[in-house]
């Protein structure tokens, strides 16, 4: 059953060795992942000022820029042309502005930024009015568990006295995952019922997808989740930032975006795997 797969791998392996040269370093930018060499590959790309340092750029865009003589983040930031062949003019302008903001923000505690959309139904205009009941929540998932396990739920909010609060739910198995899901939905639904101006902020689509997945997995809280979704209680801040701002950071992860509004942390933030 695996003969064709093995033959293909063997062919690729032998072809790699035929072309291998001690004097020719592989280009990290041509790899999809670096495994245990991630830090070293990052150093090479950083030293080369490679175009992959530009936030949200794609491999196809990099190839087209390089074909037109733009081979570094600095060259893109300094580009004098208004467009290049086979690339949308607006996309090129956005990439150039992104590169320029990143170059200008280097060695700065607070990155440069630019508003790029201020009309209805896009960008910052999607932010709803403030409510004292607003909250922010995040989920961490463990993909190596069968069908995944949403093992950590964290929520920040303000209580009735105005003091900052934090709730967390942990799950080490499927039963605890169900309990975390139902407890979270019960709590936020009651909070929203008492204040229909409340919104639940999150960063990226993962949280909403996880709630839908758990609702289907356990067959509970369909009414509550559907009601919250239909009333647009959930607000994706990642979508708002991507549509509304250009930020001089190499990534638009929340760990990078927070450089806009808070001082540099004294400690490292744990990744999902580390947590």
Language-model regions: role of each:
Residues 1-28, 36-40, 46-52:
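Accessory nucleic-acid engagement/destabilization modules that flank
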Residues 29-157, 165-166, 177:
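C-terminal extensions
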Residues 18-23, 33-36, 136-142, 212-216, ...:
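Short, mixed-charge, low-aromatic patches
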Residues 24-32, 270-274:
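Short, surface-exposed recognition loops or helix-turn segments adjacent to catalytic cores
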Residues 25, 39-45, 50, 58-64, ...:
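Short, flexible coil/linker segments at or flanking structured domains
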Residues 1-19, 157-159, 166-275:
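Conserved DEDDh/DEDDy metal-dependent 3′-5′ exonuclease domain
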Residues 13-24, 61, 72, 83, ...:
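Short secondary-structure junctions and interdomain/linker hinges
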